[in-house]
């Protein structure tokens, strides 16, 4: 493990929320939320595999600006699919709910919004977060 990367990750205050987790806890949290979709075991495991380096976002303060997110629209229980994702730009709170303003990655700049109430949102873990989780995994043994 690179000690300098670990020290940098520990100094970054935005990683503070991650200190209560391990890789195992994140995987369990992702699995539990996916189980609520009542998909087949195969479909659930496929989604879990695609979300290996992602953390389920339950509250808006957990989202980091500039992070890559993927989501599963849950309005239609017969059409459950994981999106390709986008970059999270900002949070918008309206009378209609809380929305994530996102930007397509690799396309001409196009902003759009997704509702936190109508989607399960997963945020990609950064390299710093992965280093920190690796250390937390080691400490939990």
Predicted regions: what is each one?
Residues 1-16, 105-141:
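Intrinsically disordered, low-complexity, charged/polar segments
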Residues 1-37:
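Terminal domain-start segments
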Residues 29-65:
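Mixed-charge, Lys/Arg-rich low-complexity intrinsically disordered regions
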Residues 60-78:
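Short coil-to-beta transition motif at edge beta-strands of beta-rich domains
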Residues 65-68, 85, 97-98:
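Short, surface-exposed beta-edge/turn micro-motifs
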Residues 76-96:
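Short beta-strand-centered aromatic/proline hotspots
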Residues 89-109:
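Basic/aromatic-rich interaction segments and small domains that mediate binding to polyanionic partners
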